[in-house]
């Protein structure tokens, strides 16, 4: 029999409010509204479908403080992670958010109303206290703490929800089950004992082995329940991961395993998150849950030490297992024995027996360089999916981002580089010349710091999309401010290579080379806040290459860039 939901009743607000959704939708159109963030959208979906039972809304102050301080709601039920709706002072004033007010919550993708919140209270959370107690340290190296201090707004709104409609999904719809649907699916399959496996990473042979062992030891079936909401920054995208999971599923014994996707926004909260994950799986009807070593750990703190001990998560779920109400299965690390061609638990390896493993870092290196990935480590079908999403360097996109004063020679080098790269004929090459991007992307902008930063952000977005598509993007703005350059790098490098090239031609030479007389116009006061004259140029301290056109020719400069790309494998043989 499927497990009883946390709190005794599954809070499926879609079912509860099904008879009045038409009237709720009509009312929502008349109400002040809040457009949700991506994390709030994930939280709302699990509030509405019962995944966060017993919650029926975002935490009010009393529940919030209880969860932060004692891991309990005001009614005494165990709950470890605050589920809050953060808003700004401006949103409060604009929507007149106050107790008893009804607010429509809108999907950020299409602005459709998803729910109506009846406000109970508005309060200012103690973010440092939340960071210290929930996540173990007020350290912004932790992604959830960084979110608290740098992204989350200053106030929380607590209140109860009514469901208008569910968020739309257009990907992997057949694998998205609400708790109600998954419980019905288990009933149809006549599954009475189900082990759930949580993951935010691709799965390989070792994962298949450890999950099969867990299911066999418990005489249970298996639910692969990966997170497809928000995970740790830098994780592999969920589209790739789901293709991996689908490639892996036929490797399980027939009828043993099912795949269901969980739209959860992870906090990487370690021990507390492990308890939270177990409660969520309990609500989805499973009877057992695998908790791993350093479960949901974010890695190192700002001092280079792990935020959590390797077994803290397992210890906390063990402490509260009677309240969690499902059996916790400790994650068994397995390792490959080439002598016997099998995976065996790491703690059962006889002394002197050779074992093999490939780390995540080594796997990424092999994917980037095109080196073989042995079949003992992963299935060919899985490797094929990963190679499609992670081609070798000479098939990846990259951006060459020039920075330097006006008339420093950036455009001449950029155009020559475009011609040189076109000789390769292995990828599309796009040049975002400064005069073109000003005219086509930022014609309404001036030369203030704010306008320059916006201009750079727009160019970085375009370059990032080109890089994502496997093209070579050449960008040649002045880009005088380090903060904007660093933001551009962050935008682009998640999709491929990024090289900052400083064209360090002296100001005096730039003035001599200025055929358009821009510097003279700036000196006469016709152009305000002009870089190099009455606005600063922050010299890069992190450039990948520095070029002075007075000391080398355009051809020499291009050759240096080509050598840099060749060294890193972006051009030439894989």
From Swiss-Prot:
Signal peptide: none annotated. Its EC number is 2.7.7.4. The active site is at 199, 200, 201. The record marks 331 as: Induces change in substrate recognition on ATP binding. Allosterically inhibited by 3'-phosphoadenosine 5'-phosphosulfate (PAPS). Keywords: Allosteric enzyme, Amino-acid biosynthesis, ATP-binding, Cysteine biosynthesis, Cytoplasm, Methionine biosynthesis, Nucleotide-binding, Nucleotidyltransferase, Transferase. Sulfate binds at residues 198, 200, 296. The record marks 204, 207 as: Transition state stabilizer. GO terms for molecular function: adenylylsulfate kinase activity; ATP binding; sulfate adenylyltransferase (ATP) activity. It catalyses: sulfate + ATP + H(+) = adenosine 5'-phosphosulfate + diphosphate. It comes from Mucor circinelloides f. lusitanicus. This is Sulfate adenylyltransferase. It is found in: Cytoplasm. 3'-phosphoadenylyl sulfate binds at residues 435-438, 452, 478-479. In the N-terminal section; belongs to the sulfate adenylyltransferase family. In the C-terminal section; belongs to the APS kinase family. GO terms for cellular component: cytoplasm. The gene is MET3. One of its GO terms (biological process) is methionine biosynthetic process. ATP binds at residues 198-201, 292-295, 334.
